[in-house]
């Protein structure tokens, strides 16, 4: 019967690990606070109200060249598993915690402030 106990312990460890991953993802979403004041590259405060009007999921676009040539620029916002752009007139700042998302956000800053996944 010790094998059944080992299986239950293993199952408990797996469930605990899944719980930790879910809470860390939730903390990333909470990081974008409604009342938080963001600053652009010029140090000017940007409005950060939820829901953001003009938020676009650029992962649905097959050709991003017309987006990059647009006069509007966006701020990349990491909401867990995807990056979203908040469209603004001037180039904004990109934020993230995970290494992979930081790389995507650096590409965002280099490409007219658009999110490229």
Curated annotation (Swiss-Prot):
Residues 1-25 form the signal peptide. The keyword Signal applies. Shows more potent antibacterial activity at pH 6.2 (approximate coral mucus pH) than at pH 8.0 (approximate pH of seawater). The keyword Secreted applies. Residues 26-73 form a propeptide. GO terms for biological process: defense response to bacterium. It is found in: Secreted. GO terms for cellular component: extracellular region. Keywords: Antibiotic, Antimicrobial, Cleavage on pair of basic residues, Disulfide bond, Secreted, Signal. Disulfide bonds join 76-115, 85-108, 94-112. Belongs to the coral AMP family. Coral peptide that probably acts as an antimicrobial peptide in the surface mucous layer of planula larvae and likely also in adults. Shows moderate to high activity against some Gram-negative and Gram-positive bacteria (tested on E.coli, B.megaterium, S.aureus, E.aesturaii, B.algicola, Acinetobacter spec.). Does not show antibacterial activity against the coral pathogen V.coralliilyticus. This is Antimicrobial peptide AmAMP1.
């Amino acid at each position: 019967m010790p094998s059944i106990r080992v299986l239950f312990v293993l199952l408990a460890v797996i469930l605990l690990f899944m719980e930790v991953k879910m809470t860390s993802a939730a903390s990333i979403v909470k990081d974008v606070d409604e009342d938080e004041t963001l600053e652009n590259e010029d140090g000017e405060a940007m409005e950060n109200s939820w829901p953001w009007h003009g938020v676009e999921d650029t992962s649905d676009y097959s050709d991003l060249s017309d987006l990059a040539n647009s006069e509007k620029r966006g701020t990349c916002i990491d909401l867990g598993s995807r990056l979203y752009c908040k469209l603004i007139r001037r180039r904004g700042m990109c934020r993230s915690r995970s290494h992979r998302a930081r790389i995507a956000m650096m590409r965002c800053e280099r490409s007219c402030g658009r999110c490229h996944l």
